[in-house]
């Protein structure tokens, strides 16, 4: 059998959004490797099963990836597609991140109930629903007159709860709504200065096993996203945060992206070579502006900082993330 006729099993969470995101990879492979056999396997994760608590109240790491990681280890799947913001800071030693997709719109958005056309019509007797303290803390500054409550479930479930009248509005990621074709539900975009997005928001992470050749994905992965991921996650890691912590970072670039999504590299998945490390093919960018948000639990104080750095590799991006974290830690010392 030719190399591009090998079978590739993609693992995904079973929500509609997760499946749509996995289908972006599936569609790419089918377009450029039409003889490859591809199967999509879905499963519930721990984070999908516990819906009565906020994510930061559940505790633990990898709430949305543990089951997918085990499927990779067991050989039941060959590739996992994750929302990068759900991926723990520490990657298991026996697995690797192959690369990152081009970034969808990273901003958070306000969604009003159906029939409500303008923010001026919001009923502030009802809470605004959010799924994270990061969003709540930043939204409190924008809507000081509002109360806030947790809203869990997939995107469609949250929209249903909103339209049933449980909330005056909810805050979601623009990327999820766009990937589901629900842009019409967006009532207001928050700029990345008003509400700094979760680290990795809008980026997909492709995870696989060591010892497997994933070079067929060379044309899908983005060098810019690899650097952004390293910078944003480097900031979070340096401050000891995880995917449920009230901490966030966002990188913006001058210069062109190096994503190869428009065309395949001509390689194929051999399933026998060495695994490929994240961040391959990084391009040259003029500069990166990295913004960070951190909530200090000890003093209940919010910190925001930003830096600009010249970066061309994930390692340089990660160093910028650590530099930004160091600035916030120095500022924190003066208030404790």
Indicate residue ranges for each PLM-predicted region.
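Small-molecule-sensing regulatory modules
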Residues: 2-44, 49-50, 57, 141-336
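Short, well-ordered beta-strand segments
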Residues: 9-11, 80, 98, 129, ...
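Short, structured active-site "lid" loops
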Residues: 53-78
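Short acidic active-site motifs
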Residues: 67-68, 118, 157-158
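Ordered, amphipathic secondary-structure segments that act as subunit-interaction surfaces
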Residues: 75, 82-85, 207-214
